[in-house]
Regions:
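N-terminal, positively charged, Ser/Thr/Ala/Gly-biased leader segments
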Residues: 98-154
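Structural detector for internal amphipathic alpha-helices that build alpha-solenoid repeat scaffolds
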Residues: 2-21, 43-56, 66, 76-88, ...
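Short inter-helical turns and helix N-cap capping residues of alpha-solenoid HEAT/ARM repeat scaffolds
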Residues: 40-41, 71-72, 104-105
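Feature captures the catalytic cores and cofactor-binding loops of soluble hydro-lyases/lyases
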Residues: 155-167
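Amphipathic alpha-helical scaffolding segments comprising HEAT/armadillo-like alpha-solenoid repeats
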Residues: 1, 17-36, 56-69, 88-99
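Alpha-helical scaffold segments in soluble metabolic enzymes
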Residues: 63, 78, 147
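Short, surface-exposed loop/turn motifs that are enriched in glycine and acidic residues
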Residues: 37-38, 50
């Protein structure tokens, strides 16, 4: 139905990642799908892992660690591969990996070795040599240092000359 489609699109594309309460609900629901505790025809276990990967940290890391350090070997391996792509881990997450490693977990060892080798960076796919930007639209006041900088208030910045030269 249309409502189901809209709901799925919202869940997949519009729930903010990170540490928001909504992200927590999304991550735990995806975990339930992966474990077979919940079923959504449009979200397979593989797609649930992909969605967790795109959440890039926060509560998704906790869920991925639960899955990677669990008992189901098919799930642990897949969760470990996703974890190896993530960079936003907290100290508590690393402590969980350390404890699992010290307890003899081969999965934890593999994840830690991957981080030590910076595979989260070295295994990023190559990008094209030349990327053309066809159109970029930003309303007045919406341009910030995070995007193109300087914004319409650049005259008040002490580094405006530097920012002006970068444009």
């Amino acid at each position: 139905s249309l409502r189901r489609s809209i709901s799925l699109d919202f869940f997949i594309y519009n729930v903010l990642p990170g540490t928001t309460s909504a992200a927590g609900v999304k991550a735990h629901f995806l975990k339930a799908i992966i474990l077979g505790e919940s079923t959504v025809d449009e979200i397979s276990s593989d797609f649930a892992f992909e969605l967790l990967m795109h959440m890039k940290g926060g509560t998704s890391i906790d869920v991925l660690l639960d899955l990677a350090l669990g008992d189901d070997e098919a799930i642990t391996g897949q969760a470990a591969e996703v974890l190896k792509t993530q960079v936003f881990l907290y100290e508590a997450d690393m402590d969980r990996l350390k404890l699992a490693y010290e307890s003899g977990s081969a999965i934890a060892k593999g994840i830690l070795e991957s981080y030590a080798s910076a595979e989260f960076f070295t295994k990023i796919p190559d990008i094209e040599e030349n990327i053309e930007v066809v159109t970029y639209i930003a309303g007045e006041g919406d341009i910030s240092t995070d995007l193109l900088s300087p914004g319409n208030q650049a005259h008040s910045r002490s580094d405006r000359e530097l920012h002006g030269k970068t444009l």
